[in-house]
Regions:
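ATP-dependent adenylation/nucleotidyltransferase module used to activate substrates
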Residues: 1-203, 234
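Local cysteine-cluster metal-coordination motifs and their immediate loop/turn environment
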Residues: 118, 122, 211-239
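Glycine-rich phosphate/adenylate-binding loop
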Residues: 197-218
Length: 240
């Protein structure tokens, strides 16, 4: 499908950058649409911590191309012993296969998106109040987001936004940017191709700096991490 991007006039944007394909493409879209971009990554003790290395590498690459992104990695790894999930260190084995399989529930991290959302909202509100200008939170949500993750559902997002607006002053200057709402991973990747051309950056140089795997494999010969091509996130990326 052809994505219809709602192009923004707002100056400021805050994005949660996981280091995966979706959020990395969203970062490129934000760079194109906004004057200033703040990107946040979270270390919550995830096994696939290589995604944070990829996120930093992408930021560094974009800086060399003249794109100044304010970037912060936020340490939440003190939670690792308190969270029950296959995705965190000390958790069960990460299951393989498609998201639709029941065993994928093991990859749910309790309240993860709410934790990330609260911090992202706080930063966006701080930017909005400091500048006195409209600030958007960019979300990479898309039609392929899965019901197995309750915090990817529209009902959850609506309730989360309601809580944010009820719990803070001066929230009228904070909005949302969701360019991929009606698309899937294939559409996101196609938009990435367009954005790389528009921003005059190399597609391969960008996406080699991403990780979409819950079970990345370390190659001791090259000292590089590679996708396992078996975990659900990796299977979806290959299918795209």
């Amino acid at each position: 499908m052809q994505l219809e991007i709602d192009y923004k006039q707002t100056k400021h944007c805050v994005i949660s950058l996981s280091g995966g394909m979706d959020s990395s493409t969203l970062l490129l879209r934000a760079i194109k649409e906004y004057d200033s971009v703040t990107a946040l990554s979270f270390n919550y003790g995830q096994k696939h911590v290589v995604e944070l290395e990829r996120a930093q590498s992408l930021i560094n690459y974009l800086n060399t191309k003249g794109y100044d992104v304010k970037y912060r990695q936020i340490k939440l790894d003190g939670l690792v012993d308190l969270l029950n999930s296959a995705l965190v260190e000390g958790g069960d084995e990460v299951p393989e296969g498609h998201y639709e399989q029941d065993n994928m529930k093991a990859t749910v991290v309790p309240n993860r998106n709410k934790i990330f959302s609260s911090i992202t909202q706080a930063v966006a509100l701080s930017v909005a109040t400091e500048t006195g200008e409209q600030t958007d939170i960019a979300l990479g949500i898309h039609a392929g987001d899965h019901a197995i993750y309750p915090d990817c559902r529209q009902e959850w997002r609506d309730a989360d936004d309601h809580a944010f607006r009820m719990g803070n002053w001066d929230v009228e200057n904070v909005g949302y940017f969701t360019p991929y709402l009606d698309g899937d991973k294939f559409d996101i990747l196609k938009d990435g191709e367009v954005l790389c051309k528009d921003l005059n950056i190399d597609f391969d140089d960008v996406y080699v700096r991403t990780n979409t795997s819950y079970k990345p494999i370390f190659d001791e010969d090259t000292f590089e991490w590679y996708s396992d091509y078996k975990s659900a996130s990796s299977v979806e990326r290959v299918e795209a």
